[in-house]
Amino acid sequence: MLTCEMRESALARLGRALADPTRCRILVALLDGVCYPGQLAAHLGLTRSNVSNHLSCLRGCGLVVATYEGRQVRYALADSHLARALGELVQVVLAVDTDQPCVAERAASGEAVEMTGS
């Protein structure tokens, strides 16, 4: 059974992970499947070392896992439940602030979508 302290610790780790826009961008990218740090860096327009630092934080928070393939490391969300939970969390946040359309909806409509973060 989860104690209050365990729940608080889990929420604090999640909050730490989501507090940084770059980590949020990495999590969103990983919703599409496993990636190598170099792929994430190229996709997000960041340096590989920056991405690696953020991936280290996300691993420490328990949100991503690393799989070693020789000298390369690929990253994925830690659990399929996490992918669903992140999707639900986004929907809840958007439901609270209805003036902020979903990025995917804006992109589908042809509206320019700017992704920020470093």
UniProtKB/Swiss-Prot annotation:
* One GO term of the biological process aspect: response to lead ion
Example of a GO MF term:
lead ion binding
SUPFAM superfamilies xrefs:
Winged helix' DNA-binding domain
Q: What is the effect of changing residue 102 to S?
A: Abolishes metal-induced derepression
Sorted keywords for this record are:
Cadmium, DNA-binding, Metal-binding, Transcription, Transcription regulation
- Impact of changing residue 24 to S on the protein? Loss of repressor activity
> InterPro entries, per this entry?
ArsR-like_HTH, HTH_ArsR_DNA-bd_dom, HTH_Metal-responsive_Reg, WH-like_DNA-bd_sf, WH_DNA-bd_sf
- UniProt-annotated binding residues for Cd(2+): 57, 61, 102
Keyword Transcription regulation set for record: yes
Q: Note whether Signal occurs among the keywords.
A: no
**Boundaries of every HTH arsR-type domain copy:** 3-97
Q: What does this protein do?
A: Metal-responsive transcriptional repressor for the cmt operon. Binding of cadmium or lead causes the repressor to dissociate from the DNA.
Assembly, in brief, is: Homodimer.
Query: Under what name is this protein listed?
Result: HTH-type transcriptional regulator CmtR
Native organism is Mycobacterium tuberculosis (strain ATCC 25618 / H37Rv)
